[in-house]
C-alpha cells in the first residue's frame, strides 16, 4: 500500500495502531495527506503540524470511537479541518456525521475533502452551532471554546439519551469547574472526565455529558 507522499514516514502510526484503526486506516492515510497539502495551504493547520498529523490530530480524534457506536448520528461543531468530524465519518461509516462550521474557507475545505474521500455519510452546514435545528445522538468538538460556552452551544443539539463529547487537554478539570453555572442547569446530566485511546496507545481526555 502506498502511503501519503506528504506525511513523513517516521510519523506514521505503529503497526498496532494501524490494526486498531481497522479498514479505515487507508482513508485516514488519504485524509492525512489532504491535511498536509490543502490544510496547510489554507492555514487550517500550521506547517509544523505536518509531522504530528497522526499522533496529535488524527489518532487523537480517533480515540473518540471508544465512546461512540457505529450507526449513531453525530454532529461535530466548529469542525474546522474535519477534526474530529471527518475522522469519525471514516471510522464510523454507518453513522451520519454533520459538520457545522461558520467559516467559508473551512467549509470549502470540508466539501472538497468529503468529495476526495468519497464520504457519503457526511453533511456540511455553514453556520454557527447556535440556532441550528439539526440534532444528533452524539455532539463532538475539539479546540473550539471554553467548556461553558461549548455546552451552551452543544446541549440544544443533543437528542435525549445522547451525549456531548468534548476533547479537552490537561485543563479539563479546571474548565469543568469554571463551567459549573452551566452544568448545574443540566439537572440529572452530570459531567464526567473520561480518558480514552487505550487501543491506540494514547491517553485522550474527554469531557462527557449524557442527556437523560
Language model segments and positions:
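Class I SAM-dependent transferase core
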Residues: 1-75, 91, 105-122
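A short acidic, Gly/Pro-enriched loop at the edge of an enzyme's catalytic core
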Residues: 72, 130-138
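Conserved beta-strand/loop positions that form the S-adenosyl-L-methionine
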Residues: 77-79
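Conserved SAM-binding loop of SAM-dependent methyltransferases across substrates and taxa
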Residues: 81-94
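Helix-to-beta-strand junctions that scaffold the AdoMet/dcAdoMet cofactor pocket
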Residues: 92, 158-160
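Short beta-strand element of Class I
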Residues: 94-100
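Active-site capping/gating segments
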Residues: 98, 171-212
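Conserved SAM/SAH-binding loop
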Residues: 125-131, 144-145
